[in-house]
């Protein structure tokens, strides 16, 4: 089980990403369309002034049950340990133990 502070920090980051997503995307589009160097520098400065935690790459994928950041399966939102246990208990529809 991950520390509660780490899980909460990640939740806070997700909220910030959602809050600033539109603004960040608009600045990036303007930056790509900018022609002069001074305009690009100004847009880059504005982009840098956004909160650091509002960048999507600062968010870590975590298991929604345990908060574990490693061994994460995107399809389920679970870490490998919980995925295995839930699959054995039949709690994940369509997941069967492989056999060949």
UniProtKB/Swiss-Prot annotation:
It comes from the Bacteria. Keywords: Ribonucleoprotein, Ribosomal protein, RNA-binding, rRNA-binding. The keyword Repressor does not apply. One of its GO terms (biological process) is translation. It holds the Pfam family Ribosomal_S14. PROSITE patterns: RIBOSOMAL_S14 (PS00527). GO terms for cellular component: cytoplasm; small ribosomal subunit. GO terms for molecular function: rRNA binding; structural constituent of ribosome. Part of the 30S ribosomal subunit. Contacts proteins S3 and S10. Binds 16S rRNA, required for the assembly of 30S particles and may also be responsible for determining the conformation of the 16S rRNA at the A site. Belongs to the universal ribosomal protein uS14 family. PANTHER family: 30S RIBOSOMAL PROTEIN S14, SMALL RIBOSOMAL SUBUNIT PROTEIN US14M. This is Small ribosomal subunit protein uS14.
